């Protein structure tokens, strides 16, 4: 296969609606306000702390930051589906449309890698223990208890992820929180955040 430079690598994403040159970290929260506050804290610290085994389904002893390798349309569809589950089946709140996006090659340089979807015990047999943070359980053997997160196309960064504002884009769910985010930056004299970030994506504009 012919070597591919970055220009041609990016061209592939341009012509494929199912691919993205960016990966997205969605902030969690039981409410929209909590998820928004978590996003603000990440921006103020310029750091995403890794989830641990006790708090975020991470295998092994190494914390990891979780991101999704999916285009915005797919992320928007996943968010809509999760909202439907919460309303119809009283599922636990996972994500509410707040997040932060990075160029994939930036994450790669931070030692971010795609996760490995497999049965946990099987994956532990062929991965060294210091790579167990990459394991995400996949089990389709029981029709009554399917475990499948492959739709998230997850990447993980071991430890924590530090960044500069110029390396990220912000995601908010709607115009209300777009205005609230801008107001926060102005009220707190953090215009530098607004001026340096690569952009702000309003998920509601992706839906319709």
Could you describe each region identified by the protein language model?
Residues 1-208:
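NAD-dependent ADP-ribosyltransferases
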């Amino acid at each position: 296969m012919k070597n591919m430079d970055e220009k041609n690598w990016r061209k592939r994403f341009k012509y494929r609606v199912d691919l993205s040159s960016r990966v997205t970290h969605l902030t969690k929260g039981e409410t929209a306000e909590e998820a928004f506050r978590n996003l603000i804290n990440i921006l103020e610290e310029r750091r995403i702390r890794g989830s641990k085994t006790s708090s975020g389904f991470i295998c092994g002893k190494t914390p990891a930051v979780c991101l999704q390798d999916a285009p915005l349309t797919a992320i928007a569809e996943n968010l809509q589906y999760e909202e439907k589950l919460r309303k119809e089946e009283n599922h636990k709140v996972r994500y509410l449309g707040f997040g932060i996006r990075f160029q994939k090659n930036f994450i790669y340089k931070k030692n971010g890698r795609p996760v490995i979807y497999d049965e946990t015990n099987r994956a532990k047999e062929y991965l060294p223990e210091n790579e167990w943070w990459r394991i995400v359980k996949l089990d389709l053997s029981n029709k009554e208890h399917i475990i499948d997160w492959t739709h998230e196309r997850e990447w993980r960064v071991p430890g924590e992820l530090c960044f500069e504002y110029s390396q990220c884009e912000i995601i908010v769910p709607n115009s209300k929180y777009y205005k609230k985010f801008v107001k926060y930056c102005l009220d707190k004299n953090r215009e530098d955040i607004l001026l340096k970030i690569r952009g702000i994506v309003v998920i509601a504009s992706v839906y319709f």
